[in-house]
């Protein structure tokens, strides 16, 4: 029974780590060239929403449009928490592994896991 629990915990940890790695590579900013500067701001906002920012690049006369997506909170994991790696160590590991990562030890199925929250 304990072997099954350990295997299940290992697979769950791998799934969390994989999902968090996929979320890390998603961009939060979209920059697009909308050709000529004519009605630049209007076209930018129509295509990417009211919070988008437009800029006419003078020398080449092209309209640049940047849209920003709000930061999303994601959850990941690093390793098990132990006496040698308590909550402060877990928090440090999360900060190293994930951008703006913060972590803490959480009891799950009889194990103390280091769980991280980070913006993605």
Curated annotation (Swiss-Prot):
Alphabetical GO biological process terms: defense response to fungus; killing of cells of another organism
Keyword Amino-acid biosynthesis: no
Cellular component aspect of the GO annotation: extracellular region
Keyword line: Antimicrobial, Disulfide bond, Fungicide, Plant defense, Secreted, Signal
The organism's place on the tree of life at top rank: Eukaryota
Family label: Belongs to the DEFL family.
Protein name per its UniProtKB record: Putative defensin-like protein 179
Species this protein is from: Arabidopsis thaliana (Mouse-ear cress)
Gene name, Swiss-Prot/TrEMBL: LCR57
């Amino acid at each position: 029974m304990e072997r099954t629990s350990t295997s299940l915990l290992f697979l769950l940890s791998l799934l969390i780590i994989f999902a968090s790695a996929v979320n890390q590579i998603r961009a939060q900013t979209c920059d697009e060239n909308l050709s000529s500067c004519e009605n630049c701001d209007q076209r930018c906002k129509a295509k990417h929403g009211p919070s988008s920012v437009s800029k006419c690049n003078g020398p080449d006369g092209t309209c640049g449009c940047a849209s920003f997506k709000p930061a999303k909170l994601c959850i990941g994991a690093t390793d098990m928490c132990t006496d040698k790696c308590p909550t402060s160590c877990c928090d440090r590991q999360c900060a190293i592994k994930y951008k703006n990562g913060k972590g803490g030890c959480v009891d799950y199925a009889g194990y103390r896991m280091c769980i991280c929250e980070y913006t993605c």
